[in-house]
Each structure stands twice: as C-alpha cells, then as structure tokens.
Amino acid sequence: MHQYSGTVLAREPDFDKNIRRKYGAPFVDLHRVDLQRALYDRAQELGVKFQLDERVENVDPAGPSVTTKSGHKYDADLVVGADGLWSRTRQCFLGTADEPKPTGDLAYRIVLSLSQIEDPVLRLWISKPEVHFWIGPRSHAVGYSLKGGNMYNIVLLVPDDLPPGVAKESGNVEEMKKLFEGWDPV
C-alpha cells in the first residue's frame, strides 16, 4: 500500500502464499474475459448446454427453471445468475427490483500491454505479479498484473460526479490527469 506520493505505507511479503495458506486456494488476478472463458470451457467439458442471444423473462428457483422472452422454458439442475449490474436473474430471485446502489466512486480503467512500455523500470514493475494500492485525498488507485505479467490493469477511483441515471461515460484524459496531479509517477 502506497501513499499517493509513492511512499510505501505497508507491505505484505509473500501475499499469494499467505492467501493460499489461509484459504487453501491461490490468489489470482484474472482479466474478466479469461475467467469467463475458463468457466465456459469447463462447463462445456461437463456437458452444459448454452443458449445464447436469449433474454431471461423469469427464473423459478423452485424448479429451477428459466423462461426466456421468446417463451422457451429451460429446466435445470442449477441456475447461475451472472447477468450483471442490472440483473434480471437477481430480480426474479428477490421478487422485486434491485437496482444498483451508488458507491460514490467513479472508476477510470486503464489496461496497458507490456509491449507498449519502453521504460525498463516500469516494465519490471508491470511484470511482477503484485497488487498495489495508492491512497490519496478523495481518491485511490489499484494496479495489478494480468495475463502472466504481460498486461497491467490500473483502476483510478475518484468521487462520482456523473448525473443521476448515467452509469457509463467516455473518460476525459485531461480531467483525469488533473485529478491525479502530484501522484506517484509510477
């Protein structure tokens, strides 16, 4: 953990080993697409049938079954609700609308490819499988390696100033630079 200026505030050596020891499983940073692909591939190996391009109309947890907008009903052993922020599956299970709750944070996301980085110090930083946090006034940042150290994900969090009802908007690079002026250059 770093102060926004770069000063190290705390460090946990062997974080991944400690996680494995404590939980009996590894700590892994994955790109969401890689996780989705791994789950999809394994499910196919186990014989799961996928029906793509269907909208869920209803989920009956007692069945369990799923009924789509086109009227098809699918009986299942298990229904996995992984349909995102505005989840219809969650709404069906709860029996009521469950809109996302604002966190007060707005996230700028940046993914860098190691091949794009020329600075040797930054290349070494990115290639290490470590998670870094920076804490600053009214903002914080998280950075970690992806794809075996070939990519680096950075999430910059600032107070949310989007209008009500707007969940996503193109970022403004100049605004972001201003918000993080004086921060650790790494």
Task: Please identify what each model-predicted range represents.
Residues 1-42, 46, 57, 134:
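Active-site-adjacent segment of FAD-dependent monooxygenases/related oxidoreductases
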Residues 37-186:
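Conserved FAD-binding catalytic core of PHBH/FMO-like flavoproteins
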